[in-house]
Amino acid sequence: MNWEPSSLKTKSLPYSRQFIDEEDIEAVARALQSDWLTTGPQVEEFEKRFATDVNADYAIACSSGTAALHLLYLANNIGTGDSVIIPTMTFLATANAVRYSGAEVIFSDVDPDTGLMNASHFKDAINRSTNKKVKAICAVHLNGQCVDLSSFCEEIDKMIVFEDACHSLGAFRWSKSGQKFRVGSCSLSKATMFSTHAVKAITTGEGGIITTNDENLASRLKKLRSHGVVRDKDLGNNELINL
C-alpha cells in the first residue's frame, strides 16, 4: 500500500459522525413514553429486522459488542483450559472477552495490506499451539473487508467458528461458485456478532447484537443476557443457572 502524502485524499471520511434525524428522535421518544424502556417489543422488532437484513434465523440484542462476544463464549462453554485464536489487528475487546471467560488468547498474524487473518496465518497459529486446547476461532472482518473462511485448512472443522463483524455491518462475500453471502448470515460460522456503538455503521449509543442459525444457541444467549430470566408462567425451574 502507498502511504505517501501525495497519494492520500485531501478530504477524509468522518469518524464517529452519527446521523440522527427527526425520525430517530421520535422513535426514542415513543420508547420513553411506552411501558418498556428495555427488553420490550421494540427490541424484538429490531432483532427480527436485523436478522432478516443479514439473512440469519435469529438475532439477539445486548448491551455492547463486548458483551456479545462474552455471551458467545459463555453460551458455548468456553472457559478455563480452552484457547481461542484471534487476529492481532482488532479492538482490544476481542481478546478481553476471551479472558473474561477464563480462556487463553492465541494471536494470529494478519496480512499487512488488509489487516485480515488468512489461511496461512491461521495454520501458523495452530502449529504454534499444539500443546493447547484450541476450542474456537474468532475471525475479525475489518473495515468492511471479509475474512475468507472458506479458504482455511481442515483444522477449522474441529473447532467452533465465530465472526466478529463490529466493523463490517452490510458487508458481503462471494463464494467460489459465485453465490453472495451477507456477513451475519453465519453460512460458515456458528454465530456472528456486531456492535452498535456510536462509531459504527448504525448506532444505538451503546449496544451489540449476535446472529445465528442455531435455535438452541439463540435460546441460551437470550437467557444468559438477562441472568436466566424467562417470561414463562409454566416454567418452574431454570436449568441454565441451576435453580
What are these regions (language model features)?
Residues 48, 150, 181:
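Active-site phosphate/pyrophosphate- and oxyanion-stabilizing loops and adjacent acidic/basic residues
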Residues 1-37, 41:
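N-terminal "arm"/small-domain region of PLP-dependent enzymes with the aminotransferase-like
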Residues 74, 78-142, 146-156, 160-176:
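PLP-dependent aminotransferase-like
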Residues 33, 55-56, 155-159:
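Short glycine/proline-enriched coil/turn segments at helix->beta-strand junctions
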Residues 36-83, 97-101, 107-109:
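Phosphate-binding glycine-rich loop
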Residues 167-181, 188-243:
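Active-site region of PLP-dependent enzymes
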